[in-house]
Amino acid sequence: MPKTRRKVNIIGHRNPDTDSICSALAYTYLKNQLGDAVYEARRAGQINRETAFVLKHFGVEPPRLCTDVSPQVKDIDIREQPGIDKEMSIRAAWSMMRDTEIDTLCAIDEDKELLGLITVKDIANANMDLFDTEVLAKSKTSYKNVLSTLEGEMLLGDPDACITSGRIFIGTSPEIMDGAVNPGDIVLVSNRYEVQMCAIDWGAGAIVVCCGSAVPRTILARAQEKGCIVITTPFDTYAAARLISTAAPVRHFMRSKNLLEFSVNTAVEDARKVMAN
C-alpha cells in the first residue's frame, strides 16, 4: 500500500496584499511541479478589494483562510508500527521492542481496534515481580507461549492447551519436594530420574526437563498415565526459571483502561499539557 503523500500549506504574511496572495499561489504551483508532497496555498487574513479584483480577472480561486499554524499531532514524525496479538508473550514483546528500538506496543483485535498498550516499564515491572509463581495460571498462558519462550519441545501433551492452575516450582530432590509439590504445579527438573518420577506421582501438571536431557520412556509412560505434560528445554534450571514467567501473555499486563487519546488535529501544545498532568 503506497504511503499517503504529505500535505504542506504555503502561507503569505498576515493582512495579505496582492503580492502575498499571488506569491503563495505561484510558489504552490512550482512546488507541486517539483516536489513529492501535496502543496496548497493559504492566506492569513481577509482579501482586500484589489486582490479580489486580480483573482477574479484571471479566474483564480482565492486561497482558503488559515487562522492557526500551531503544530498538530499529525505534523509529528510518528513511527507507524503493526499491532500485536494480545496473546503474544511478554518475552516476545520485549524482543520486538529491542529489535525495533521502540518502547510501546499496541495490542489490537481482528478488526485492528485498539485493546491496550504494553510498555517497556510494564514488562520491567512484570519481570521484577519474582514472587508471583502463579502468574502463568492467573494469565491462562498457552503452552505454545511456554514452548516458544523456553525454545522447548513438548514430548507429551497439547500445545494449544492453557495453564489454568498450579504454580512454578523447582524440583531439586525428593526430600525437599515431598509435601511441597501441589496438584497442577509446573515443576522444573534436571535429569535426575527420581526427581522427575516424584514430580509426576505427586500430581504435577507439567514437568520441564532442563539442559536438553533425554527423558526415559518409563517417565513418559508414567506421565501419560497421570495426565502430566512433559516439556524439554535446552536451558539450565536457573535460566528456565527466569524465563518461564515471561511466557505470560501481553493481555495480562497491558494497560487497557484510562488511556490518553488525541485526535490527529489536536495541537501539540495541548497534548503536551494533558500528558504532563
Language-model features, listed with the residues they occupy:
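Divalent-cation
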Residues: 130-139, 157-217, 231-233
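Short, solvent-exposed cationic patches
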Residues: 117, 133-147
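A short, polar/charged loop-to-alpha-helix boundary motif
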Residues: 120-136, 241
